[in-house]
Amino acid sequence: MSAPVFDPATYDAQLAEKQQRLIELLAPFAAPEPEVFDSPREHYRLRAEFRLWREDGQRHYAMFAPGDKHTPILLDDFPIASLRINELMPRLRAAWRASEALSFKLFQVEFLTTLAGDALITLAYHRPLDEAWQAAAEKLASELNVSLVGRSRGQRLVIGRDYVEEELTVAGRRFRYRQPEGAFTQPNGAVCEKMLGWAYEALGERDDDLLELYCGNGNFTLPLATRVRRVLATEISKTSVNAALANLADNGVNNVELVRLSAEELTQALNEVRPFRRLAGIDLKSYDFGSVFVDPPRAGMDPDTCELTRRFERILYISCNPETLAANIAQLSDTHQVTRCALFDQFPYTHHMEAGVLLERR
């Protein structure tokens, strides 16, 4: 993880620059003015990863400037990280400095927290973890009131749980999420909640079905499922699928069918190119899909998946890379038009931005 340049005094100007960049990217498609959802200026990031750097005989939290992996920036705190992470950082450092079992060949620390106050710490080592480590880790987890995961090559030891629990409110309803260690979660919880609210409103109340690609742990699935008759959701990561199934059950959402397929495989299934055993018992022809929701990786949708979305009246698209979003819109622009768009400032003080668009059939 690279160290961002943190300067709250520049926040508004940076956000205005991102807004202008998004307007320019979407200008060829006659998109409306984007709705802008800002971020807290500090303590917004719910996860953080630090290398450990030895100096003066002690290990320090360290990050690196972009493009420079050799000159560490030593840290005592991290203002963009959640208050919980900042509270844990000095206490964890004191613990490893007082314990050879915890510090020996420790090279990386990852924090995962939630708006609900839950926390998990992952400690990565260049050595096998033994009983002495386990005893020290159990004591530390109790003292810090966290779960701990110890990792070394071929080894993963869990003290407590291997996930954190989050609560997000959408349209007055609170949704509970399990967020597994090592799986993708939105880093900016406050902005994530705004994204969920925007997507919920943009989709609207429907009496037909929704197809969701790249559903992850069900982050969007839970609130969007309350807007439609049924949802067919796909995800390729087994860890994320298991988390999504648990989240659906925990929230009493029972109108979602979840299948472990890639977007490309689902395209083949819908086009009847080939059958998939993982779709056994699911009658694809029974669905009356009116909308598709996509939240693809930075590369965007591949051309075949993009063509698949063309079949739908409404395409609700969340993008972590507006450049590939624009390329996908260009492919769809002869049949669909952008009727709503939004900028979500997930990553303050960086050039990265998250965008959302609603495309509707012309």
UniProtKB/Swiss-Prot annotation:
The answer, when asked if Cell inner membrane is one of the entry's keywords, is no
Q: What is its EC number?
A: 2.1.1.-, 2.1.1.35
Which residues are named in the active-site annotation?
320, 354
Give the matching InterPro entries.
MeTrfase_TrmA_AS, MeTrfase_TrmA_CS, SAM-dependent_MTases_sf, TrmA_MeTrfase, U5_MeTrfase_fam
Q: Which residues bind S-adenosyl-L-methionine?
A: 186, 214, 219, 235, 295
Electron transport keyword on record:
no
* Gene Ontology annotations of biological process type: tRNA methylation
* Role summary: Dual-specificity methyltransferase that catalyzes the formation of 5-methyluridine at position 54 (m5U54) in all tRNAs, and that of position 341 (m5U341) in tmRNA (transfer-mRNA).
Family assignment? Belongs to the class I-like SAM-binding methyltransferase superfamily. RNA M5U methyltransferase family. TrmA subfamily.
Name of the featured protein: tRNA/tmRNA (uracil-C(5))-methyltransferase
Q: Gene that codes for this?
A: trmA
